[in-house]
Amino acid sequence: MDLWNWDEASPQEVPPGNKLAGLEGAKLGFCFPDLALQGDTPTATAETCWKGTSSSLASFPQLDWGSALLHPEVPWGAEPDSQALPWSGDWTDMACTAWDSWSGASQTLGPAPLGPGPIPAAGSEGAAGQNCVPVAGEATSWSRAQAAGSNTSWDCSVGPDGDTYWGSGLGGEPRTDCTISWGGPAGPDCTTSWNPGLHAGGTTSLKRYQSSALTVCSEPSPQSDRASLARCPKTNHRGPIQLWQFLLELLHDGARSSCIRWTGNSREFQLCDPKEVARLWGERKRKPGMNYEKLSRGLRYYYRRDIVRKSGGRKYTYRFGGRVPSLAYPDCAGGGRGAETQ
């Protein structure tokens, strides 16, 4: 049995260009220099090589050498391009580079890893940070820090001081809810909400809801007197209607022939139902206490003005005077319309 003599053994050398791919916990894409071992030094191990080269990397930034697996075209002994170095973190926030790029956990080919920064919660101020993640076939690509397969939802709220606050969170469906309140012509309780939702087809639906404290004033229902007198033709007069004008309206209305009618003797007319005529006149003037005695006093006022005169021979019979414009009246005796008189 031959004994191994350490003094006679040739020094062990690390082969040049070795990537040490078999070392677990380190993925180094650069070459190691040839290290000559002393005669009394045992075989070089990964720990010895690590200690020998880690001091030379102190001046370099923390690089994600594990992401080099996504670039199969890079040769084993080639130095990585300084412009295509995949930095993990936000370029504007160097604090995000604290991610341990020398992690011992092995990485597998798949989706790009998430950035080290925390995912911005809904309601946080400012825009969400961006991460530079290497993609196969490209140098770098920028993407927002969000979970794979999920969408981003933005919430907009307007505070009492008028400032607008935007926040992003993770949700199943993109949504944007914006509620604005103001005190305008519609009152302080007027609120308008917009809810535009994004559907899978790329279409946008906008829903607007508006509530107001305004009260709607309904039109007052017409009085019974106006409804009953709406069928009467109006005479051409200005100002408030007078009694003789109202009597002409009733005479021109065939539906009122039971209470007032022409006698056929020139401009003479007769009150067949004086109480009904007085009631209609009271409804028109909004005087519910109107009666025939008050109406007759108004007719006597027209006597000396030659507008209405008392016609003798019949009770409740009157005649229009010469001051009344020419009018046509039906000739009851002849069954037709009489001639115009002055």
Curated annotation (Swiss-Prot):
<dbReference type="InterPro" id="IPR036388">
    <property type="entry name" value="WH-like_DNA-bd_sf"/>
</dbReference>
<dbReference type="GO" id="GO:0030154">
    <property type="term" value="P:cell differentiation"/>
</dbReference>
<feature type="DNA-binding region" description="ETS">
    <location>
        <begin position="240"/>
        <end position="320"/>
    </location>
</feature>
<dbReference type="Pfam" id="PF00178">
    <property type="entry name" value="Ets"/>
</dbReference>
<dbReference type="GO" id="GO:0045603">
    <property type="term" value="P:positive regulation of endothelial cell differentiation"/>
</dbReference>
<dbReference type="InterPro" id="IPR046328">
    <property type="entry name" value="ETS_fam"/>
</dbReference>
<dbReference type="GO" id="GO:0005634">
    <property type="term" value="C:nucleus"/>
</dbReference>
<comment type="similarity">
    <text>Belongs to the ETS family.</text>
</comment>
<protein>
    <recommendedName>
        <fullName>ETS translocation variant 2</fullName>
    </recommendedName>
</protein>
<keyword id="KW-0238">DNA-binding</keyword>
<dbReference type="GO" id="GO:2000382">
    <property type="term" value="P:positive regulation of mesoderm development"/>
</dbReference>
<dbReference type="InterPro" id="IPR036390">
    <property type="entry name" value="WH_DNA-bd_sf"/>
</dbReference>
<dbReference type="GO" id="GO:0000978">
    <property type="term" value="F:RNA polymerase II cis-regulatory region sequence-specific DNA binding"/>
</dbReference>
<dbReference type="GO" id="GO:0030218">
    <property type="term" value="P:erythrocyte differentiation"/>
</dbReference>
<dbReference type="InterPro" id="IPR000418">
    <property type="entry name" value="Ets_dom"/>
</dbReference>
<dbReference type="GO" id="GO:0007219">
    <property type="term" value="P:Notch signaling pathway"/>
</dbReference>
<dbReference type="GO" id="GO:0000981">
    <property type="term" value="F:DNA-binding transcription factor activity, RNA polymerase II-specific"/>
</dbReference>
<keyword id="KW-0539">Nucleus</keyword>
<dbReference type="GO" id="GO:0016055">
    <property type="term" value="P:Wnt signaling pathway"/>
</dbReference>
<dbReference type="GO" id="GO:0001228">
    <property type="term" value="F:DNA-binding transcription activator activity, RNA polymerase II-specific"/>
</dbReference>
<dbReference type="GO" id="GO:0048514">
    <property type="term" value="P:blood vessel morphogenesis"/>
</dbReference>
<dbReference type="GO" id="GO:1990837">
    <property type="term" value="F:sequence-specific double-stranded DNA binding"/>
</dbReference>
<dbReference type="GO" id="GO:0001890">
    <property type="term" value="P:placenta development"/>
</dbReference>
<dbReference type="GO" id="GO:0006357">
    <property type="term" value="P:regulation of transcription by RNA polymerase II"/>
</dbReference>
<dbReference type="GO" id="GO:0030509">
    <property type="term" value="P:BMP signaling pathway"/>
</dbReference>
<comment type="function">
    <text>Binds to DNA sequences containing the consensus pentanucleotide 5'-CGGA[AT]-3'.</text>
</comment>
<dbReference type="GO" id="GO:0001707">
    <property type="term" value="P:mesoderm formation"/>
</dbReference>
<dbReference type="GO" id="GO:0001824">
    <property type="term" value="P:blastocyst development"/>
</dbReference>
<dbReference type="GO" id="GO:0010628">
    <property type="term" value="P:positive regulation of gene expression"/>
</dbReference>
